[in-house]
């Protein structure tokens, strides 16, 4: 077990925007395009700037059918960020059994895109 001394407190708040999509009903037989939008606000209430990493997991394919096409992450123009994207396969191969149990499409049954963004200097009250 390792120890890491903490020199100062970090006060970071993440809130979801009211304009975010909360629910989307779809079937794979329908080929209509629907737009989903999620907004998150990150607020640094601390006394100093700090580096942060933000990671998004987005289900993009289920049984070789596209469920979310070309997910994008954008930041406020005043933030400098670098994002890396990679696809990850699901740990469960029997997606039908999992969907019957939970009725939730997530990265345990779908191929997901992992989008990791590093923000080297997240200023106070940004």
From Swiss-Prot:
Function: Integrin ITGAM/ITGB2 is implicated in various adhesive interactions of monocytes, macrophages and granulocytes as well as in mediating the uptake of complement-coated particles. It is identical with CR-3, the receptor for the iC3b fragment of the third complement component. It probably recognizes the R-G-D peptide in C3b. Integrin ITGAM/ITGB2 is also a receptor for fibrinogen, factor X and ICAM1. It recognizes P1 and P2 peptides of fibrinogen gamma chain. Regulates neutrophil migration.
Domain notes for this protein: The integrin I-domain (insert) is a VWFA domain. Integrins with I-domains do not undergo protease cleavage.
InterPro entries per the UniProt record, alphabetical: Integrin_dom_sf, ITGAX-like_Ig_3
Family in the record: Belongs to the integrin alpha chain family.
Keyword field contains Glycoprotein: yes
Protein name: Integrin alpha-M
Quaternary context: Heterodimer of an alpha and a beta chain. ITGAM associates with ITGB2. Found in a complex with CD177 and ITGB2/CD18. Interacts with JAM3. Interacts with THBD. Interacts with TMEM268; this interaction inhibits ITGAM degradation via the endosome-lysosome pathway.
Pfam family, one: ITGAX-like_Ig_3
Native source organism of the sequence: Cavia porcellus (Guinea pig)
Residues with attached carbohydrate: 25, 78, 106
Gene Ontology CC annotations of this record: membrane raft; plasma membrane
Topological category with respect to the lipid bilayer: Single-pass type I membrane protein
Gene symbol of the encoding locus: ITGAM
Keywords, alphabetical: Cell adhesion, Cell membrane, Glycoprotein, Integrin, Membrane, Receptor
SUPFAM superfamilies documented for this protein: Integrin domains
Gene3D superfamilies named in the record: ntegrin, alpha v. Chain A, domain 4
Compartments, as annotated in UniProt: Cell membrane; Membrane raft
One biological process term in Gene Ontology: positive regulation of microglial cell mediated cytotoxicity
